[in-house]
Swiss-Prot record:
Protein family per UniProt: Belongs to the EutQ cupin-like family.
Catalytic activity, as annotated: acetate + ATP = acetyl phosphate + ADP
Gene: eutQ
Keywords: ATP-binding, Bacterial microcompartment, Kinase, Nucleotide-binding, Transferase, Virulence
Self-association and partners: Homodimer. Interacts with the N-terminus of EutM; a probably cytoplasm-facing helix (EutM 'Val-49' to 'Gln-64') interacts with N-terminus of EutQ.
Any one Gene Ontology molecular-function term assigned to this protein's record: ATP binding
Localization annotation: Bacterial microcompartment
Protein name: Acetate kinase EutQ
Organism lineage: Bacteria, Pseudomonadati, Pseudomonadota, Gammaproteobacteria, Enterobacterales
Entry's cofactor comment: Does not need divalent cations.
Pfam families named among the record's database cross-references: EutQ (PF06249)
Pathway recorded for this protein: Amine and polyamine degradation; ethanolamine degradation
Residue ranges of the region described as Required for interaction with EutM: 1-100
A single GO cellular-component term on record: ethanolamine degradation polyhedral organelle
Length: 229
């Protein structure tokens, strides 16, 4: 079984003072959010084959996060800031940038469909569009499997940070949380699903979707035209 490398794994390693992590490609799955957090913290993820020794000597051009980091440090009083403060400010800047981009970005992804209709989506290629049903909150949504694939079900990714919004489901939905935690408020109680958990929401439910932190999950809905029923 492959090991799932999540954003929390990166944060924990960084908190321990580590600056890099080596993973074996064939035995690991690195989530997109883990890569984003690693870039944010200046943390290096080295991907290697089992037969190749881990190396952290790769030198690359300055990434966007490094440029943001340098700009932030340049505006802070010399010697009067901590790495934790810099990380918090970087996260704020990148989230604001992501929110602006999300407002104009069209959802997209790379996939391959076989002759018999079997479809494989490259999870790392997924770019989010904005879910209109959650305005004014910036909620990302990308449909990956739709009626156009000849499917009676739909599937896709959703993600957002620190927001709650009402929604009524005229369809059945199953959600598998990939990152963070998903809160669903319904009939006076709050159900919480964390990374690795699966949640079922029956048709006809009037709920409040949300998270006090951040969440990214895979949804499967029936029927496939869930947005128009």
């Amino acid at each position: 079984m492959k090991k799932l490398i999540t954003a929390n794994d990166i944060r924990a390693a960084h908190a321990r003072g580590e600056q890099a992590m080596s993973v074996v490609l064939r035995a690991s799955i690195i989530t997109p959010e883990a890569r984003e957090v690693a870039e944010l913290l200046g943390f290096t993820i080295t991907e290697c084959d089992e037969s190749v020794p881990a190396s952290t000597s790769a030198q690359a051009c300055k990434s966007e996060s490094q440029r943001i980091r340098e700009a932030i440090i340049a505006q802070l009083p010399e010697g009067q800031f901590t790495e934790s403060l810099v990380a918090q400010l970087m996260e704020k800047v990148l989230k604001e940038k992501q929110s602006l981009e999300l407002g104009t970005m069209q959802p997209s992804f790379t996939s391959v469909t076989g002759k018999g209709g079997v479809k494989v989506i490259d999870g790392s290629s997924v770019k989010f569009g904005r879910f209109d049903g959650a305005e004014p909150h910036c909620v990302g949504l990308t449909d990956l499997v739709t009626e156009q694939d000849g499917s009676s079900m739909a599937a896709g990714f959703m993600q957002w940070d620190n927001a709650f919004f009402p929604w009524t489901l005229n369809y059945d939905e199953i959600d598998m949380v990939l990152e963070g935690e998903l809160h669903v408020r319904h009939e006076g109680e709050t159900m919480i699903a964390k990374a690795g958990d699966v949640m079922f929401i029956p048709k006809g439910s009037s709920i409040e979707f949300g998270t006090p932190t951040s969440v990214r999950f895979l949804y499967v809905a029936w029927p496939a035209n869930w947005q128009s029923v």
